Amino acid sequence: MSTSKAITLTLFIATTLLAPCNAAANATTKPLFPAILIFGDSTVDTGNNNYPLPTIFRAEHFPYGMDLPDGKANGRFSNGKLISDIIATKLNIKEFIPPFLQPNLSDQDILTGVCFASAGAGYDDLTSLSTQAIRVSEQPNMFKSYIARLKGIVGDKKAMEIINNAFVVVSAGPNDFILNYYEIPSRRLEYPFISGYQDFILKRLENFVRELYSLGVRNVLVGGLPPMGCLPIHMTAKFRNIFRFCLEHHNKDSVLYNEKLQNLLPQIEASLPGSKFLYADVYNPMMEMIQNPSKYGFKETKRGCCGTGFLETSFMCNVFSPVCQNRSEFLFFDSIHPSEATYNVIGNLLDPLIRGKFQA
């Protein structure tokens, strides 16, 4: 056999053998959804509060974002990625989700999805009165502007196809309870029992996701409450004890709310043809990390990495604040918000649940 024929045959065999591998690789890297859309509060706000808003709830300054690839703060309330970024990466949509208010969004940014969330927001409009954040109830108006721009890029039919098949994340609630019930009792006269206020918030949540559905959304992940009694700032405000135990009665409130939410979502899904709703449990994973920290590589779960870790968040966590060196060993980055390491654990748990629900 001539040398040229031998080379040709070798290349043919190699190409044939590698073809299935390439096909498998393409299958695994193909996005499960065409776009990802984010609504809610600081747990998922990727930088909307950077832009002209009269709010102090900002994270566009060091040390926020210090573990991002460029090491620069961009509005995310963590040292690195948020849970929404991690989910988007795992679903092969994009690595980072841009905020909708970012002025230089590209067509590709619009096509693959953006974030409408605002740090300090809540389902209760009263929450944003004190924080000056973009109310959750206002975020659908931003979404309508997004839809108009999307239609301008790909046309009406393709735009609605993208929205119908997009993956949507809704994450809010903690601010409502902290600002309107626990720390500032502005809703206690109206709702003397926490269960009544929970029902009010859940009704607001239901109205919100129904509005998203009316705009074309079909695939929705809804986040529950974290263990509110274990947030460092909450322990500082409510617990004058050097041992800093979690506030169990507030954790019980979170459990009750989450149980109600888990019961509500299937009811909403059944009433909205073609919709799929998935509950995102953050409470149990975080409690597991708090109770068994070494299993996940954590050494500190009762305070944040920034400053003393007891009070600092937003403008109080700043360039003058000392920052821990071993950020992957801290459950919280500031006194409210989880570290990227925590979000990675939660993202790993959510990924198979998302695929199981939405690939079926």
Curated annotation (Swiss-Prot):
One annotated GO molecular function is: hydrolase activity, acting on ester bonds
List the InterPro entries hit by this protein, alphabetically: GDSL (IPR001087), GDSL_lipolytic_enzyme (IPR050592), SGNH_hydro_sf (IPR036514), SGNH_plant_lipase-like (IPR035669)
The entry's family comment says: Belongs to the 'GDSL' lipolytic enzyme family.
GO CC terms of this entry: extracellular region
Domain of life of the native organism: Eukaryota
Provide the protein name. GDSL esterase/lipase At2g31540
Q: What Pfam families would the database entry show?
A: Lipase_GDSL
Q: What is its EC number?
A: 3.1.1.-
Query: What's the source species for this entry?
Result: Arabidopsis thaliana
Q: Which GO terms describe its biological process?
A: lipid catabolic process
Keywords, comma-separated and alphabetical: Glycoprotein, Hydrolase, Lipid degradation, Lipid metabolism, Secreted, Signal
Q: Does the keyword Secreted apply?
A: yes
SUPFAM superfamilies with a match to the protein in the record: SGNH hydrolase
Catalytic center residues: S42, D334, H337
As recorded in UniProt, coiled-coil segments are none
Compartmental location: Secreted
Q: What is its main location?
A: secreted
Point out the glycosylated residues in this chain. Answer: N104, N326
The residues forming the signal peptide are 1-23
